[in-house]
Amino acid sequence: MKDYFNYQGKICVVTGSSNGMGLATAKMLVDLGAEVYAVSRSATKIEGLAASILCDLSKKDEIDSAFAHLPSHIDCFFGVAGLSGSKTDYLTTFNCDFTANKYITQEYLTKRMGKGCSITYVSSTAGLNWEQHRNEQNKVVHASSWEATEQALGKLPVTAPANFAYIFAKRCMSQYAAEQALELGKQGIRVNNVMPGSTETGMKDEFEKMAGGKEALLNETGVAH
């Protein structure tokens, strides 16, 4: 594959890399000649990886352990890991889908990145219209630590099932990415938030079930091209 994006030799970290979009991202980066570190709950089986590191992104201590084995300089970070909420509780879903990315950014990426580096969060169309929900998002997005984020989340009047944590996390992710694009942009670090519609990954069946069928899901999310 021709390296139009200049990834040759770049140190890249990809979360959620054992399947779906994360796996596809890691494969492409390896093909482009990047030094790829795959971080996921299951082993990432790609020839040419620099390392495959096991990590449950919903747990702070496992993130700390994973980053202890990652390089002191990172050129590109791809936060792809996510849970739908159909098989996990509210807090676990939210921590994997939002808190982990915020913690990694604040605790590690700001210290291991510099001018010319980039951060890409893979969210979804569930994060659209986040601007309309700032009042409920602000305290969570602006919480100073992992523990403070959980405390702020716990104070919200939420009685919805765990799959709503997916939606709320994606809205928070959209707001956080927009704010960090401005803040980290001052240091020359580029921040993007990718928001695909329905995509053929392992979680698609879970989303179809929660939405009430394939057509209902497509009507709600659209299709990623």
Regions found by a protein language model. Give the residues of each.
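Rossmann-fold cofactor-recognition segment
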Residues: G48-D61
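Catalytic loop of short-chain dehydrogenase/reductase
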Residues: G85-K87, C117-K186, S198
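Conserved glycine-rich cofactor-binding loop
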Residues: I11, S18-N19
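Short, flexible catalytic-loop segment of classical short-chain dehydrogenase/reductase
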Residues: L128, M195-E206, M210, E215-A216
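Conserved Rossmann-fold cofactor-binding substructure of NAD(P)-dependent oxidoreductases
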Residues: S58-H73
